[in-house]
Amino acid sequence: MDSVLRQSKAVCPFMKKATASSLRAMTTAARPAASPCGGAISKLQVLAHRCPVMGKAMAVQSARTGGRASAAPASFVHKAKLHTGRPREAQAVEGVFTGQKAGLPPHPPVKPTTATAANPSPAACTVSGNFGTKFNYEKFYENELEKKHKDKSYRYFNNINRLAKDFPRAHMATKEEKVAVWCANDYLGMGRNKHVLEAMHTTLDEYGAGAGGTRNISGHNKHAVELENSLAKLHATDAALVFSSCYVANDATLATLGSKLPDCVILSDSLNHASMIQGIRHSGAKKIIFKHNDVEDLEKKLAALPLHIPKIIAFESVYSMCGSIGPIEKFCDLAEKYGAITFNDEVHAVGMYGPHGAGVAEHLDWEAHQRGETKGTIADRIDIYSGTLGKAYGCVGGYIAGSAKLVDTIRSLAPGFIFTTTLPPAVMAGARAAIEYQMSYDGDRRLQQLHTRAVKEALADRDIPVIPNPSHIIPILVGNAELAKKASDKLLNDHQIYVQSINYPTVPVGQERLRITPTPGHTKQFRDHLVAALDSIWTELGIKRTSDWAAEGGFIGVGEAEAEPVAPLWTDEQLGIADAVAELRAQASDEKKGVINQLLESVALEQEREALNAAEEVADAAKAAAASA
């Protein structure tokens, strides 16, 4: 620097008069506030631009480099750092699903010319002028979609319009095309429950369509407060917080906690939902994957971590694609032993399990919760619940529930909550009505469980392979993406039955399936129609039956000779059918027909829908009596 200054002072009259220290000061000083120049320049550069000699030289230099400079990324001053913008990302998962590592779909190799066009070097992207061609965005989209078509994982949407007055039927593009829907997540038919609809109609008429803003600005209202109070009551927690969906609830909560807790490590079940995986990734926290429902594997990973660092064990209670149920009590034991907190996603369980519909954690201590004794139960040991206002509750939205300080932390820090318009008042009123209804009446979930058992029995009689599980999910194994799609299409086109095929990436390649979800409305005529159609299609397409899988040694629980029978989570005693089942079995009745199918045909349960409607009338009367009191 000193040698440059000496040379400059010998040439420039201005610099001859200036001292070396003043010149150095001008090179580090910021430009004047009124300077019109772009970028950060020194006072010396400003003066040089005014010089008749240096000004011309700098103009030439600026013209030569201007193209590259204008294409360079802009530098933003005072850029806010959100927790989702951390430079460190969660470690990538090798296989989200069991067996995924060896089961990726075979994508066609990309030709070198295609790779060059689709993945240009950074220089090619930033240099303007005649330095290559512009990026072909439409071609990129086309290539990505072509991959999906070739590996048979491209998704087609069916036009399904569910009919509130003809549940569980729907019409397709035209009202004349009626189909029976067997794969909806409105598990209990609450989307057409009269109490829910009345609450929504009344609220809509009085308060209008939208909430009018975020919770912080104009969108906080009595409907949100009442709904969150009902959710906190459901889970016996201090507080709850409502989100626009459970995807957002999971993403926002895990991202916020993982980024804010110092040196946090999140231990995640290998089959966790995409929303949880995304939230962990957004958190930037270290992520450790443990084998699905494997308590021993989880403990090994916990034991290897320092006791003092924050840890979150993230899992689901019911896994929607296979129907398995998490070992919640054992996870709580490990959390307490190793200083972790638990994050329990009850999305597919709320409304479906437990005396009050609070989920699997409540169901595991049935008698205690029936008595209202929640202290010390498994449910009481959970730190964070997440759940949905859709599915069993028939509306839309998601939530978390937990301690008051936890909920307030997420409320105050999570962008996914802060910057989203509040759910419409009518939706929140309907969701609250559904929650309160299911807390006081268990007839829907009991009938749903009976219908689930009946379908599983009937499919077993036809040698149709159901992946064993203790829940309300009925995953029928196909094992081939193309066959799964064909089976779904034939059900729809030939039998007017809608069951969506489930392919990669939702499930691993080779484990493609049809997923059936019975409801209280799927009575005998619907069941018989479904089972006969599946039997016919399995024969027509040559899809493997349970005996075929058994001949090959079994696969993911289907046809495995030494596999233990899987008992339903709902016991006969909890369903109130223990005596009737014992009597039927003692009579040595028709085993091929299945005990539950016989039970549903018996005099006691012959009028299923009438009994359900009568129970609703009783609930109405109780509600009216409570209001008058």
Swiss-Prot record:
Transit peptide: 1-69
Required co-factors: pyridoxal 5'-phosphate
Catalysed reactions listed for this entry: succinyl-CoA + glycine + H(+) = 5-aminolevulinate + CO2 + CoA
Pathway membership: Porphyrin-containing compound metabolism; protoporphyrin-IX biosynthesis; 5-aminolevulinate from glycine: step 1/1
Gene3D superfamilies in the record: Aspartate Aminotransferase, domain 1, Type I PLP-dependent aspartate aminotransferase-like (Major domain)
Broad class of enzyme this protein falls into: transferase
Residues the record lists as binding pyridoxal 5'-phosphate: S320, H348, T388, T420, T421
InterPro entries: 4pyrrol_synth_NH2levulA_synth (IPR010961), Aminotrans_II_pyridoxalP_BS (IPR001917), Aminotransferase_I/II_large (IPR004839), AON_synthase_class-II (IPR050087), PyrdxlP-dep_Trfase (IPR015424), PyrdxlP-dep_Trfase_major (IPR015421), PyrdxlP-dep_Trfase_small (IPR015422)
Cited Pfam families: Aminotran_1_2
Catalytic residues as annotated in Swiss-Prot or TrEMBL: K391
Self-association state and partner proteins as the record states: Homodimer.
Family: Belongs to the class-II pyridoxal-phosphate-dependent aminotransferase family.
Functional description taken from the UniProt entry: Catalyzes the synthesis of 5-aminolevulinate (ALA) from succinyl-CoA and glycine, the first and rate-limiting step in heme biosynthesis.
Name by which UniProt lists this protein: 5-aminolevulinate synthase, mitochondrial
Source species of the chain: Neurospora crassa (strain ATCC 24698 / 74-OR23-1A / CBS 708.71 / DSM 1257 / FGSC 987)
Species lineage: Eukaryota, Fungi, Dikarya, Ascomycota, Pezizomycotina
Gene: alv-1
